[in-house]
Design a protein with these regions (language model features):
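C-terminal cap/substrate-recognition subdomain and adjoining C-terminal extension
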Residues: 11-16, 24-141
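A positional/architectural concept
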Residues: 1-13, 21
Length: 141
């Protein structure tokens, strides 16, 4: 799947990938199997995780990138430096993201498109091909 290749590209570019989701059953299992940190947000405002991410990952909010598709994502999108959404996000999110709407529907290689956009805009450095291929050999990927 192109999204898992994109996660490896992000990681090999030095970018920490984190799942933050209210859908814990499926996403937590996927994250665990792929060695991706997972935070469950059901019942908690997602922006409350900003301070956790700052201290845990030593990153400032304006350096963070977030992809979301529902109204529950708006509060955290307003606090991070880069907010993106899939093309089938709810209207409020599409309006907020305006120039950052990925031309993919959710679940259709959005992370692959996100990587391409972030790399082309110099938001992230180019990925390290050798590290990428080494990650591909890892049992968890």
């Amino acid at each position: 799947d192109k999204d898992f290749s994109a996660i490896k590209k992000f990681k090999s570019a030095g970018v920490k990938v984190i799942f933050l989701s209210g859908d814990t059953n499926i996403n937590e299992s996927i994250a665990k199997n792929r060695s991706i940190d997972f935070y469950a947000s059901r019942g908690v405002c997602k922006s409350a995780f900003i301070n956790i991410f700052k201290s845990t990952y030593n990153i400032l909010p304006d350096e963070m990138c977030y992809v979301g598709d529902d109204i529950f994502d708006l509060n955290i999108m307003k606090e991070v430096g880069y907010s993106f959404c899939p093309s089938n996000a709810v209207k409020t999110i599409r309006e907020y993201c305006c120039g950052n709407i990925l031309n993919r529907v959710g679940g259709d290689n959005c992370l692959d498109k996100l990587f391409d956009v972030c790399e082309s805009r110099n938001i992230i450095p180019p990925f390290d091909e050798e590290l990428f291929y080494n990650l591909d050999k890892d049992d968890k990927f």
